[in-house]
Amino acid sequence: MGTPGEGLGRCSHALIRGVPESLASGEGAGAGLPALDLAKAQREHGVLGGKLRQRLGLQLLELPPEESLPLGPLLGDTAVIQGDTALITRPWSPARRPEVDGVRKALQDLGLRIVEMGDENATLDGTDVLFTGREFFVGLSKWTNHRGAEIVADTFRDFAVSTVPVSGSSHLRGLCGMGGPRTVVAGSSEAAQKAVRAMAALTDHPYASLTLPDDAASDCLFLRPGLPGATPFLLHRGGGDLPNSQEALQKLSDVTLVPVSCSELEKAGAGLSSLCLVLSTRPHC
């Protein structure tokens, strides 16, 4: 059976989608925010891809940018992946629903079992779903409703699935994430701390917790691309983005920290974990 939580972060491949010029036009989630520097956003995205491929050693697949999908780079919202199963989501925004088509095909080509939501009353953004290695938490937010959470539970029946209220316009993974198989990291805002308290009340598993000054710093990815026993990585927002959280992140001593920047992409609503999908095609991962 192995150690509980040992499957967290196992990965061999990463999927990203290029940044289209339309992302800077204000048509997406960044409308009303400061103007987005397209070239800088594309550089950030390129560096992220480079870190996934070169630093972490993942097989990187990049879908081409599509001008009709300004928020296409936020493909973390389009699927929930665990083991060999990919649940294709139904994003809250109707304009974003065509984003799932290219992701579905890419995941099919990698041999994953595809599950469709198939309920027009359900909404689900992938970044509202947090997998701890032992269980799932699904944020009930502006973006994700009860029916969406029920479909997560129906799809991943081997795991407990609990719902966590998320206030405002945040996604759950914009408030908290996994710093390791037994460690939840969370921002210091009331919304983030409320989410962590709700998770603690719902779980049967003991998790350590680490509070970070910035909510956005908790949107990180714990990844284990190597062989069992190899030191895992934590892909996280670096000091150029969130300097106040770097000292706290150093307390995660059992991981190799890999900093990246997405401060420009953030203007379009991107959190770090929304910018890629990671998966394993290896057996027993």
UniProtKB/Swiss-Prot annotation:
> Is the keyword Transmembrane in the record?
no
InterPro entries listed in its UniProt record = DDAH-like
EC class name:
hydrolase
The record's tissue-specificity note reads: Expressed at high levels in kidney and lung (at protein level). Expressed in islets of Langerhans.
Any keyword ATP-binding?
no
- Where is this chain's protein located in or outside the cell? Cytoplasm; Mitochondrion
Put simply, this protein is called: Putative hydrolase DDAH2
